[in-house]
From Swiss-Prot:
This is ATP-dependent helicase/nuclease subunit A. Keywords: ATP-binding, DNA damage, DNA repair, DNA-binding, Exonuclease, Helicase, Hydrolase, Isomerase, Nuclease, Nucleotide-binding. The lineage of its organism: Bacteria, Bacillati, Bacillota, Clostridia, Eubacteriales. GO terms for molecular function: 3'-5' DNA helicase activity; 3'-5' exonuclease activity; ATP binding; ATP hydrolysis activity; double-stranded DNA binding. Belongs to the helicase family. AddA subfamily. PROSITE patterns: UVRD_HELICASE_ATP_BIND, UVRD_HELICASE_CTER. It comes from Clostridium novyi (strain NT).
Amino acid sequence: MGEVKWTKEQQQAIDVHGCNLLVSAAAGSGKTAVLVERIIKMITDIKNPVDIDRLLVVTFTNAAASEMKERIGKAIGKELTKHPKSKQLQRQLTLLNRASITTIHSFCLETIRNNFHYIDLDPNFRIGDETETVLLKGEIIEGIFEDLYEPENCTQEFLNLVEFYSSNKDDVALQNIVLNLYDFVMSSKNPKKQLQDMAEQFNVDESYNFGESKWAKVLMDDVELELSGLKDMMEEALKLINDTNGLDAYLEGFTDELLMINDLILNAKTSWDSLYNGLSEVKFGRLKTCRNCEDKKTQEKVKDIRNKVKKQLQDEIKKKITSYSTKEIVTDLRNLYPIMKSLCDLVIEFMDRYSKAKKERGIIDFNDFEHFCLEILGHEEVALKLRQKYIEILVDEYQDSNYVQEAIINSIARRHEETGNPINVFMVGDVKQSIYRFRQAKPELFLKKYNSYLEGENAKERKVNLFKNFRSRKEVLDGVNFIFKQIMSENIGELEYGDDEALYLGADFEQYEDKSLVGGPIELNLIEKSKDETKEEESEEEEILSNIQVEARFVAKKINELVNPKIGEPFKVYDNELKAYRNVEYRDIVVLLRSTSNWAPVFTDEMKENLIPAYADVGNGYFETVEIKTILSLLEIIDNPRQDIPLIAVLRSPIASFTPEELIDIRLENKDGDFYGGLLKVASSEDRDDNWILFKRKCNSFLEKLNYWREKSIHMPIDEFIWYLYMETGYYGYVGALAGGMQRQANLKILFQRARQYEKTSYKGLFNFINFINRLKVSSGDMGSAKILGENDNVVRIMSIHKSKGLEFPVIILSALGKNFNMQDLNKRILYHDELGFGPDYIDLDKRIIYETVPKSALKKKIKLESLSEEMRILYVALTRAKEKLILTGAVNDIEKSAKKWSYALEGEDYKLSQYQVMTGKNYLDWICPVIMRHKDGEVLRELAGIEIFEKVNLLSDESSWKITTDNISGILQNDDETNEIILEDIKEIEDIEESSSYYDEINERLNFKYKYIESSKLPTLLTVTELKRMKNSSMYEDYSRDMYTPKLVKKPMFMEKDKKLKGAEKGTAMHAVMQKINYSEELTIEDINRQMETMVEKEFITKEQADSVEAEKILNFFKSNIGKRLLKAENVRRETPFHMELKSTEIYESLPKEIYENENIMIQGIIDCYFEEEDGIVLLDYKSDYFKEGQEEAIIKKYKVQIDYYARAIEELTGKVVKEKYLYLFYGDKEVEIK
């Protein structure tokens, strides 16, 4: 493999030193490779080699840091093969493991650990788990509100705040505002100061000049942008008037109105008062009549333009600016000040209490990482030490940095002696791919440097543009450039997309003999959704297809066309490993969606309907899965059974298996009370008939289980209890047998893991765990289903655009382009912005009316522009994931009406679309389709808009290539029929096969097929250790084909027993129950043991019969024995520990052929009576109450050896420690027996 040929710009990014360097790396430009090469060059420099641990490399994720280390390691290894004796390279390989290649959070954490004493932090601090911090925040915010409601603390400002921003029924909405505002300000360098400054913006007096405020500037800029759009429309109208005979009467009026708009634009650039006065005088005269115009179509178009301009200017812009005088604005601000101050005080109070609570618990959270680090770096000696250590700081994905992270980097950067500016920071990223504003990323940090840094060699602050794309085909790059050169600007996108920002071809794809099967134009497929007006005749299938399904089904057909040679020509992709073209596979195709919520499940279902293997990587839906809702309902009723909804959910589930009719009977027993009361009444009711007796027993059985589980939940850790419920109820195995069983079981495992994390916190108990889960749903959103897919699985992946960032795929299908942007946040009662502060609604409590304040209007405009800019960058990320083929799909309600709306693009003469029109776009199609309207390949769209072929339109000359198609429900269903016809034709081809045909034997063999692995279907999926012991001690256990694993009723039901005294096994169970619960912390006597058993009976842990069957003397003898004394001395004792582990079926059934059954696993479960730890290992102890004669100890050992060995193995897997000794304690003979 030859040496890498770096481009001129890449080489500059690798070689330039001695100044701050910003590398603007376009999508697919090889920025990671450049970053690695820059580091390698530095550590292998002959004159001034730099040790790898003298560099600070900051990455965005832990995965990126690991990949970076791996790449650097490989690069060093490669250099070592050239220079095997190089001590410098060997040293770098050694230093690599401790090199500072890390995320900013990891760097902050290391700085805190090394300098904790500067901020009075306990050196034994730990990182608070999300489980703990969610609960802690909830606890604190509730405590604050409770305190503030106390008469001595309650203020009118607080009550007004509650009135303003709480819902009608509770103050949860206000609590969430406080929590969200806390998260928001924590991305600033000084959160408390920012909050105070935000409140103080409302602290104004009568002399306040609103026109000088940031709010006024935003509104003026917005009005200027809107007016510019209206100006373009009026200029287009005047052009039509001048070019059309008979419209002269319109000329004077339109000209005057255009001049009026020009004056207003000048006013918007001048001052608030100038704009206010100008808009106050806006009037539109009556339009003169034109009787001689023969071109009625143009005349109507001109009138329509004027009506739109008039409506927008008078009803929207004028109303927005002139509704409030400056005096009224000042009054609103002054009235809002105490409310805003109260809100800020509330957030600061939360901040203080939360910090105090974390300190008391010895924990820190992720927000603390950056703020504590910044506080430590405020001590010059620490900053100086790090400044001297790091010769260069390299920041990856710089476009996603925030203000705190920027301050941290600047604190440790070396500085120019004269200017004081940083000189050793290398920043690489692409602001066009900054899509994490919701995580408080600040792309303006990148943009400020991008606009101020120079490209010259002598620049003290220098930038390099990497514009060559080494990922995608020319067709993809040309299409991306064609779109973004027209829509991305400083206003929307926050960057002017010009030649410097465009993508240029860097990849070299080999030629293929049939060019129609590779690459090709970008496809845009427009699908017409169901119109409001229903057709007179509509097929049943058309009626049941939802709009999302229509698009999903179309995408499925498109995938089949690409992959299935029977349906369409097989598309070819280039395989880098094979160094050749091959047929596209499902794993090469990714369907991207802006949001997977609601959409991904529909797409997955449609794929499955079309026999396409698909997997959706969704970020939500976890808490809505049946299995999780059922288990959470079970936990809720174990905590408190008097909750109707979760109780009914459990009763209807396979855990209890009650029928709807039985639930009705329960309700009828307690019509006015709760459902649990109904259950109790049925259980204690008089016998009526045979059916009622069985029903009553069913209720009693469930109540007994529920009471037992409630008792169990008190004494078991939550994670162990949840796993116990899975096994005890059989629900884990049940869901595994359903469709998608692996996914369902994986979801249950996630809940178990969450419980395990919860157990590590300072919170305990089932109630707190349920509270945590409920808070998690609200605060952190849904967790997303468990991941069960491997990277190499041959499936179509459906994922969000955010998840695809940094990845690349041969074929991208970007769907749901007709889905409107989500602007719901703009409707919240209060908005906030790091530059503009608060934007609240005002609520007149006397008149009970709510209205939008001027500050809120300003914030809505600002946040909308920033949101649209983010959406534009998200679109850029999506389009640039494609290597070879890009397919776009989107649905619209009325395709002709939409096309007419998009045709505005044909009216402008500038290359860029009207920024006003781009701003009014509601979805991605509103940006993409106007662009393609202006392309020679956009003829389909122009025809839909009613533009005749002979009409003169302004088309742009461009190398991009597009294929536009339109479809609707009927067309998609017809395609279904055509696909089915193809399959039917294949069947007909083999219909008349004679016996002598070469197919006969194959068909005969298939029809008489016998499953080769029939025995595997008879293997159990789960065994208890007791069953395993019984089988292995049986001479028949190797006969795995017997149906001995089918559950059998081997015990007579209790209600049929005449003599209800406890049998031997039941006595053993009673002894185990007592040994599990007995408190041996004090010196025991027979009286103590009897007293404890009485308490166990009172608490219903054991029955009176069970207590009577246990001899207290036997228990006392145990504790006097050698093994009992050792147990009493042990510090860590575990009793009744449930476990599960997987074993290979060939280990259990040794006669099974390994080559066939090697991958067949069986789940083993059991409960270990007792084990305890000593210094040199673990001692396992199992209690037995078997009757035996003197001298039969060896028989007992033989009987239980298998069981004890599995217990020991389970303990070693659970603890990672060695089981040094294994004992049976035989209560019958008061003997301990060691099992070797």
